[in-house]
Amino acid sequence: HGFPTFAVSIAVEHKGRLEHAVIYDPMRQEFFTASRGDGAQLEGRKIRVSSQRTLEGSLIGTGLPFRMDPGLVDSYLAMLKVIMGTAAGVRRPGSAALDLAYVAAGRLDGFWEFGLQPWDTAAGVLLIQEAGGRVGTPTGADYSLGQNIVAGNPKVYEELLAALGPLTPAALRA
């Protein structure tokens, strides 16, 4: 379709821990990197998650799950309705990897999506963690690759969990 939102996303996992991450946006020529314990960078400059204190003033990224079970669509739309009614704005650019990099860089205050694959999230998870953010599941459990994801700066992350958790059906709780 020629829609220019895509990225190269690479992560190195060693003994079950994400150690290094790279997300490259060839359209904007931006290079995001992180190494465990060394922080996150954009073009070699340290980045941090936003300092936004509430969901009400935040910009949230999401995606529309790929081939979602039709029985779960209403649940997802209910979540979208709550976030759209609370946040300053919701964006759906199309690349989960870039959305997560944008959370790490403070361009987005939070993110959630269901049905992503490990290659969609691995690099972004480490970027956010190294930039001072939080990543988990919709129920607040620790995130493991391949699970449904909620991420953000620490304050917005907690508010996203409070908003999304009660609306998350059992089939999407992993």
What is the predicted role of each segment?
Residues 113:
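Short beta-strand and adjacent tight-turn residues that come in two discontinuous sequence segments
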Residues 105-110, 133-134:
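Alpha-to-beta junction loops
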Residues 101-104, 125-130:
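Hydrophobic residues within well-ordered alpha-helices
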Residues 1-8:
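Glycine/serine-rich anion-binding loops at beta->alpha junctions
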Residues 119:
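Acidic donor-binding loop at a coil-to-helix junction in glycosyltransferase catalytic cores
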Residues 9-100, 147-174:
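Acidic beta-strand-loop-alpha-helix segment within the catalytic core
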Residues 132-148, 153:
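Acidic, metal-binding active-site segment of PIN/NYN-like and related structure-specific nucleases
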Residues 21, 40, 124, 131-133:
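Small-residue (primarily alanine) positions within well-ordered alpha-helices
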